[in-house]
Each structure stands twice: as structure tokens, then as C-alpha cells.
Amino acid sequence: MIPGANGYRLPTLCEAEYAMRGGDPNAPDWDYLFSGAVSEPGKERYSINKGLDPVGWYQYNNKTGVSGTSDSDRENNTYYSYQGTHEVGLKKPNRLGLYDMSGNVSEFCYGKIDWTFTSKIQYTGELEINPVRIDETGNGRPSYGGSWRAGAGGAIVHSFPDNIDSSFSASIGFRVVRSGD
């Protein structure tokens, strides 16, 4: 980030997670698995998770808006579809009024990452507010939110997979934020 800049930019990982969690660490939805929605009990790490249905489009509800129940639904294309993005506002917003923070399109964050570099970062024990890790030799850009092409795991509020920022995909986009004074 450029100190003192107050224009539009990509959010940092911390800003994205804060927005996904709804902005209030004391609210119950801060600990929800998805942005504004709880997980289906016992399905926290499953690709199919009906808990995501109220707030997000993903691989297993992209056709009808409701998750299938098994891989057989995937095989007969009952619910599973590579249909593409959906109009914003068809699912519920989170506490901040933001739509599609989990699902629909995965969104880039600020920074460049080489995951081998990132794994070498040593935690110093110092409190950092909104840290930004940049490795200019990296070709990965962190993203958040999951997409219509991915299972429910990609839509988890603390999941930040990397994407190659020079690649083109209908399932990756961006959302801008504006820096304060």
C-alpha cells in the first residue's frame, strides 16, 4: 500500500476477512463459517454445504440456488452446474450489507505471494495491524470468497487461496475499497 494514498484499491487480506466476517468481532456471526451464514452441522469441511445456500453461489447450488445432497446429484447435473456468475443481490447480504462475500466470484486481494516465501515468514510476536506481505517475485495473488466454480471450502471466511493474477477466468474478479485519510 502507498502510505497517505486515499484512492481506490484492492483490499488487503485482513480487510477482506474483516468485511467477510461482518465487521463486528463481538457479534455472533463473526465466527460463522461463511459470510453471514452458519455451516451445515457436521459439514464444515465438505464440498457440499447447505449452510452456504442463503448467502452464496457455489459449485453445488449454482444451477438452482439450493445445494444437492450427494455426488449423484453432481453426476446427473441436478444441482451442480458451471452456469456462471449470478446477479448481485439474489442471496442475502452479510451484517455490513455486502453481497456475495462468500461465493459467486472469488475476488483478488492486494499483495503478491510466492507461497514458498510466505511459509518462511517468521512470526515475531509483535502485534501487527493489517499486515501486508508482498513478494514481488511471486506470481500468486491472494483471493477470497470462493466462486461458482468451487466447492463450499473456498467460500470459508478464513480461506485465502492464491490465483495467478495474469490468468483470465469468469470465476475471478475484484472488489475495490477506498483508503481513509
Question: What spans do the regions from the language model cover?
Answer:
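Short proline/glycine-enriched turn/loop segments at secondary-structure junctions
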Residues: 130-135, 161-168
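Short, structured beta-strand segments at or near domain termini in extracellular proteins/domains
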Residues: 168-181
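Functional-site microenvironments in short loops/helix caps that host divalent-cation chemistry
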Residues: 1-156
